[in-house]
């Protein structure tokens, strides 16, 4: 015997539109040239920015105890885990303090972000605003874990909360700069908007698109807007 709810569902079916994701279009030629692009850009950037690496390391060390480089497990294409590198911009026990700040999360969805995060150090605030903290990921690019342009690499516990649609962010290799953040929207409180921009990039990805996003990244970093 049907319940009242089952009868109502039969008469009035759920009309909530389901998000449909187009199957990923394979682009082997693009993937080949993208890897060359990644190697050239990452290698050149490491050489040119090496003095900045040294100055940043000295500043972090001078501010207090703790490692200069912070490493963390992130996920890339097909949810493959890898160790991502960053200049440390937070206090040493930042991960432990994260649980105490969960109720202050300003980001909708699985991502944790608060505007005035008390865990960020003085040097850390500057290198985050200028995206200097992300530069060690150039090494991740050379190692093949990341690419210059692509969706930002998420944490495993974030991905554990993804629905099937959001999982498509990981259909391609994750990157140093993403379309969403280069538009100056890294502080957006909508994770869904972030996902939509990532999927838009995946659909339209190509060398011209990557060059366009790279130029947008440089402009965003120099202006201090939507820092990567």
Predicted regions and their residues:
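Hydrophobic structural segments characteristic of membrane proteins
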Residues: 1-19, 135-228
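Alpha-helical packing segments of well-folded alpha/beta enzyme cores
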Residues: 36, 134-135
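Juxtamembrane loop-helix boundary motifs flanking transmembrane segments in multi-pass membrane proteins
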Residues: 17-32, 115, 119, 154
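Short, glycine-rich, amphipathic interfacial segments at transmembrane boundaries or analogous
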Residues: 6-13, 70-118, 177-196
